[in-house]
Curated annotation (Swiss-Prot):
Its cofactor is pyridoxal 5'-phosphate. The lineage of its organism: Eukaryota, Viridiplantae, Streptophyta, Embryophyta, Tracheophyta. The modification N6-(pyridoxal phosphate)lysine is found at residue 344. Residues 1-46 form the signal peptide. GO terms for cellular component: endoplasmic reticulum; endoplasmic reticulum membrane. It is found in: Endoplasmic reticulum membrane. This is Sphingosine-1-phosphate lyase. It comes from the Eukaryota. The chain crosses the membrane at residues 55-75.
Length: 539
């Protein structure tokens, strides 16, 4: 003991003697600077691990370049030119906006004004990828039915359950009918599927992510949450990550353009709260390997969300019709939540989606309860407080009016036309279909022509397709609107490819140069700034 004390004293004296050569301020600053350096190195290492060394070095280089005199002003001027070009198609209407209330109310004249504004919209019938999923004109048939249902309940709000009990029942029935489509009757699902209606796929996704975060914090104590998504997963997951402070680990798709299960596994760590699989993914219409992702989720005890926003009202019926649909719903072990849109192939009014959970224990983490508000006790199930009961009624009317037979018939039509479009594209020299489409989204690219120039020609013919990247490609999301016009689509597409082959190069007012440049631009921060500038100027 005495030897140890003696050694400690001698060590202290030696240290004091050595440090006596330095100023007290230096001794005080040294550990702080060391701590700062350590934190900087840790942050740099984390950035490299997340984004890759090349991306980090490029970002640093671009930041340094922008500090040079005149460079930042030049970049801003060029961004302004790009934004102006993007808006040249008439996207912005700020110059003609009404900015004040009329001095004297317009009374019924407003209907005429609305009709005038509506007449300026493009001719969307049959020419849009996705967008409008119901067949026919908006003034007849199924359109007229759901519009009437909406108008009957346009004054209602499910926030006031004690007043509008009818709407509460309608929502419960819509959720229950959807749960029945997605596995609640199967023993493997556990039979406790529950959920709520939301304003759209993005809100359903936001709620599923928020719920998974809070559930895993309670269950496993995770305070620095991470989620794993494929690079083909919908951008709403990035929005959720920004809103809820969740780190995204983005995994490249495999050679079949599907979620790479091995890549997902490599990303799992002690902070992982959830993984995401799409059925199908928005870009290419391909169903991720949900069963394999479910096995991973079960093994590591984390959440698995399945994005069925596109497929929820197609895949159950396509499977019944005999199409080779891989497992995708709550029957898959490990699936904890699902989002599905009624306003797409469910043929409900815009603004209707559903988020479902495997059981009530998980869903409880979706709710917000406030006990200390002077306005009273408050609890809300979704992001919105007040919600339009008319949309709930419209969704209920859509589902019950169509019934199983109606959805089966519709699915048969759009699946058949989707396959015809796929074969037609494959027959056009210079084009290829991406992956093996499972459903009603067909993505295609080209090795011989600029596909974005093809898109510009198609746009001049009235078509509105979705432009994709990695690889550069287009897709069409087939709806009932296309079942009577798909042959015209294929003819116009072939003619557009032939036109670009004969006259390569951008057309006046086309967006091919912008899309092409954006895809090749190594500084993704610059692309993000362009998008933000465009949105700020457009709304």
């Amino acid at each position: 003991m005495e030897l140890a004390m003696d050694f400690a004293l001698r060590l202290r004296d030696a240290a004091n003697h050595h440090l006596s050569r330095y100023e007290p301020l230096v001794l005080l600053a040294a550990p702080l600077l060391a701590l700062l350096a350590a934190r900087t190195l840790h942050a740099a290492a984390a950035a490299v691990a997340d984004r890759g060394l090349r991306t980090v070095l490029l970002a640093l280089a671009m930041t340094a370049i922008k500090l040079l005199p005149g460079v930042s002003a030049y970049i801003n001027a060029e961004k302004r030119k790009v934004v102006d070009q993007l808006q040249s198609g008439g996207t912005s209407t700020k110059s003609t906006l009404r900015t004040e209330l009329p001095t004297v109310g317009l009374s019924n004249q407003v209907i005429n004004d609305l009709e005038t504004l509506k007449a300026r919209d493009v001719n969307w019938q049959g020419k849009c990828s996705g967008t409008v999923y119901i067949a026919g004109s908006e003034s007849e048939g199924h359109f007229a039915l759901i519009n009437k249902a909406y108008s009957m309940f346009s004054h209602t709000n499910p926030l006031h359950q004690d007043v509008f009990k009818s709407v509460a029942q309608l929502e419960a029935e819509v959720v229950a009918m959807t749960a029945a489509l997605l596995g609640i009757k199967e023993k493997s699902s556990g039979g406790q599927i529950c959920g709520n209606m939301t304003s759209g796929g993005t809100e359903s996704i936001l709620l599923a992510v928020k719920t998974s975060r809070d559930y895993m914090r309670t269950k496993k104590g995770i305070t620095k949450p991470e989620m794993i998504i494929a690079e083909s997963a919908h951008s709403a997951y990035d929005k959720a990550a920004q809103y809820f402070n969740i780190k995204v680990r983005r995994v490249p798709v495999n050679k079949e353009f599907l979620a790479d299960v091995k890549g997902f596994k490599r990303c799992i760590n002690g902070n992982t709260i959830m993984m995401v699989g799409s059925a199908p993914g928005f870009p290419h219409g391909l169903i991720d390997p949900i069963e394999e992702l479910g096995e991973l989720a079960s093994r590591y005890d984390i959440c698995l969300h399945v994005d069925l926003c596109l497929g929820g009202f197609v895949l159950p019926f396509a499977r019944k019709l005999g199409y080779p649909i891989p497992p995708f719903d709550f029957c898959v072990k490990g699936v904890t939540s699902i989002s599905t849109d009624v306003h797409k192939y469910g043929l409900a009014p815009k603004g209707t989606s559903i988020v479902l959970y495997k059981n009530h224990e998980i869903r409880k983490h979706q709710f917000v309860a406030v006990t200390e508000w002077t306005g009273g006790l408050y609890v809300s199930p979704t992001i919105a407080g007040s919600r339009p009961g008319g949309l709930i009624a419209g969704a209920w009317a859509a589902m019950t009016s169509l019934g199983l037979n109606g959805y089966m018939e519709n699915t048969g039509h759009i699946m058949e036309v989707s396959k015809k479009i796929q074969r037609g594209i494959e027959d056009i020299p210079g084009l290829f279909v991406i992956g093996k489409p499972d459903m009603t989204v067909v993505a295609f690219g080209s090795d011989s022509v600029d596909i974005f120039e093809v898109n510009d020609i198609m746009s001049s013919k009235g078509w509105h397709l979705n432009a994709l990247q990695r690889p550069n490609s287009l897709h069409i999301c087939v709806t009932l609107q296309h079942t009577v016009i798909y042959e015209e689509f294929l003819k116009d597409l072939k003619d557009s490819v032939d036109t670009v082959k004969a006259n390569p190069g951008p057309i006046s007012g086309g967006r091919a140069p912008i899309y092409g440049a954006a895809g090749k631009m190594p500084d993704r921060g610059m692309v993000r700034e362009l998008l933000v500038e465009f949105m700020d100027a457009s709304c």
